[in-house]
Amino acid sequence: TLNQPKNDRFIRLRFRLFDDGLGFRYEFPEQKNLTYFVIKEEHSQFAMAGDHTAWWLPGDYDTQEYETVTSRLSEIRGKMKAAVTQNSSQTPIWEGGVQTALMMKSDDGLYINLHEAACIDYSTMHLNYDDKTMTFNSWLTPDARGDKGYLQAPCVSPWRTVIVSDKATDILASRLTLNLNEPCKIKDTSWIKPTKYIG
């Protein structure tokens, strides 16, 4: 629990640990001094232990239609301009911003995936890489006024997820994100069939 005695309010930081990673989120319980509020910023950080190889897409509010770039973390800023290719709807974020899910591999072979789960009535998260501190800072998609969300307690943020494995295929097979998402609200899913889309 994180207390703000000056404002007589608090939030909870909840962690869920799994064999292959963790999730954490912010919980805003109903309380006298916290009812309706605006998210101006989220300050979640992910500190890296090295200059990992990363597979990334440029951070963009409107599209994910970019080719995946492979580079060291320290090269993201330098490769960003070439990575932002023209398409019909794009709003790139900044030179160090990448989209989630972000996949990385350390020099000793550990795969690391940063993403989110249960993103319901909340802004999606991008990551801004700070070359000097080797830290990713969360960056939420804003509205036209720059606000990141309008909430009413009780409510929760999405889960921020970290999945790790010695094998890249284990990241894909992980059930961590599934287990953190809300249960399916569709009672009968028998009509849903897999398909291919090229667009």
Predicted regions and their residues:
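N-terminal small/glycine-rich loop or linker at the start of catalytic domains
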Residues: 193-199
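N-terminal accessory beta-strand-rich subdomains and adjacent acidic, glycine-rich linkers
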Residues: 1-187
